[in-house]
Amino acid sequence: MLATEKKQEIIKAFKKHDSDTGSPEVQIAILTERITYLTEHFKVHKKDHHSRRGLLKLVGQRRRLLDYLKGKEVARYKAVIERLGIRR
């Protein structure tokens, strides 16, 4: 699970203005951190299939947010994927 302090760091790094907690960039960054955490979890717990389903839901949610951002503003989309390093 994502610690509150870590979540606050992510929000601070990706926010667009002072009270921003829900912009697509912030949401994508938080989802990416959770996906990374679960990926490491599965390296140890290979048979945790219930959590694997949750991981797939998170990946799908992030994909939808990225598609939304790409449709709205391509420059912001490219900036986010470059900062997070989620596309090759």
Swiss-Prot record:
Description of how the protein assembles with itself and partners: Part of the 30S ribosomal subunit. Forms a bridge to the 50S subunit in the 70S ribosome, contacting the 23S rRNA.
An annotated GO BP: translation
Function: One of the primary rRNA binding proteins, it binds directly to 16S rRNA where it helps nucleate assembly of the platform of the 30S subunit by binding and bridging several RNA helices of the 16S rRNA. Forms an intersubunit bridge (bridge B4) with the 23S rRNA of the 50S subunit in the ribosome.
Gene: rpsO
PROSITE patterns in UniProt: RIBOSOMAL_S15 (PS00362)
Keywords, comma-separated and alphabetical: Ribonucleoprotein, Ribosomal protein, RNA-binding, rRNA-binding
Species in which this protein is naturally found: Pelobacter propionicus (strain DSM 2379 / NBRC 103807 / OttBd1)
GO MF assignments: rRNA binding; structural constituent of ribosome
Gene3D superfamilies per record: 6.10.250.3130, S15/NS1, RNA-binding
Protein name stated in the entry: Small ribosomal subunit protein uS15
Family: Belongs to the universal ribosomal protein uS15 family.
NCBIfam families noted in UniProt: S15_bact
